[in-house]
Amino acid sequence: MIMYCKLCSNNQLTQVNSSDNRNYFLCPNCNLISVSPDNFISNKEEKERYLTHNNGIEFKGYVDFLNIAIEPALQFLKKDMLGLDFGCGHTPTLSKLLAQHGFNCEDYDPFFVENNLNKKYDFIFSTEVFEHFLNPQKEISKLVNLIDKNGIIVVMTDRWNDINQFNSNWHYARDISHVVFYHNKTFDFICNEYNLEMLYDDKSRVVILRKN
């Protein structure tokens, strides 16, 4: 099987040494590391895994975690904006937290919450979702198309910075539902490719992008 990058379509990938039984490939063009489709789990297994997560506003740890993305984003949001939580999980929580700040945010999740996504949004949060994209080019294009001009996209996903992380016990790679891993340079590529401006970057987990 010929491997190609699911973000930039480059077909000159290099295999990454890993400490598990999955096959990882690095794209030297955009620095995305992806798992071979041979190692993907089924939709049923993926959904069952999500159902084990303690999501909900009653879980302080989960709320604190979501606030890592919410707090830096507040400076870019206005009360008349309409938002979307893209990949909200089985118990939508981020939209409830934003409501406490006076913001209107709809929910969507391909497994748990239907939304026909037939409108434009002023902001989109996608927390702990990008690493699950089987086809990041397709999904990121969808997100960008859902955002109005000058709209904001808030992304939370743990980034890799050392190739040796995949040959260690890095928790992000050991989660079998995680199939793509982003680098700082990957987000530089995304900004250039989709005409986005980087408004905020914590160099670790959260980026905030604006559509030009």
Where are these regions (language model features)?
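Residues lining the SAM
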Residues: 127-130, 156
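A short glycine-rich, Lys/Arg-flanked "PGG" loop and its adjoining helix->strand segment in the class I
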Residues: 140-149
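Residue-level signal for the nucleotide or nucleotide-sugar donor/cofactor binding architecture
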Residues: 131-135, 182
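Short conserved AdoMet
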Residues: 78, 134, 148
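Short, glycine-/aromatic-enriched active-site segment of Class I SAM-dependent methyltransferases
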Residues: 157-180, 185-186, 190
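Core SAM-dependent methyltransferase catalytic element
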Residues: 194-212
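Short glycine-centered segments of the SAM/dcSAM-binding site in methyltransferase folds
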Residues: 82, 150-152
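Conserved N-terminal segment of class I S-adenosyl-L-methionine
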Residues: 1-123, 127, 138-140, 174-175, ...
